[in-house]
């Protein structure tokens, strides 16, 4: 087997043992002529989970899953049933909540570390805001929920402002 399809089996084994997650880049800042930011990306966090891995971590114990969901719901100001649905998904990654304040992200990080959970992730993300409000909004344009430029300078300079995505690779148990 190793000689006939060795490279193929090696690739399959590697894909089964690693999980790749994309890291979204921080969108570039648009400045006025005096160097003041007109469109800025603030650092926020996005919370995600590998449902299959989480169920393995708690050995399928529904009570533990519900406790984790309740604890996260309290931190994230969410409905615990919505979180449970994400825990029960048949996938390797689900978003729990996107673009939460860094303070909330820190609380989730602390909870996850204390509970010894490696399948719940807190990734750095960014959120676009305009410090001058509607000033020059017809020229600046705006971004969508995925931080993609949809109008104005945000759209015209999309390729420059969007940055280059990165990735995190984790080793997972099979």
What does each model-found stretch correspond to?
Residues 1-174:
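Periplasmic/cell-envelope proteins involved in peptidoglycan metabolism and beta-lactam response
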């Amino acid at each position: 087997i190793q000689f006939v399809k060795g490279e193929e089996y090696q690739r399959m084994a590697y894909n089964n043992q690693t999980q790749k997650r994309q890291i979204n880049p921080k969108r570039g800042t648009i400045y006025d002529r005096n160097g003041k930011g007109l469109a800025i990306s603030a650092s926020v966090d996005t919370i995600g989970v590998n449902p299959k891995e989480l169920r393995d971590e708690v050995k399928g114990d529904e009570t533990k899953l519900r406790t984790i969901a309740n604890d996260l719901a309290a931190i994230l100001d969410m409905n615990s049933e919505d979180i449970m649905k994400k825990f029960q998904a048949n996938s390797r990654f689900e978003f729990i909540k996107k673009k939460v304040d860094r303070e909330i992200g820190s609380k989730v990080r602390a909870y996850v570390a204390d509970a010894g959970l490696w399948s719940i992730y807190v990734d750095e993300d960014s959120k676009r805001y305009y410090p001058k409000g509607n000033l020059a909004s017809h020229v600046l344009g705006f971004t969508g929920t995925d931080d993609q430029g949809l109008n104005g300078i945000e759209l015209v300079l999309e390729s420059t402002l969007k940055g280059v995505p990165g990735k995190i690779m984790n080793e997972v148990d099979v």
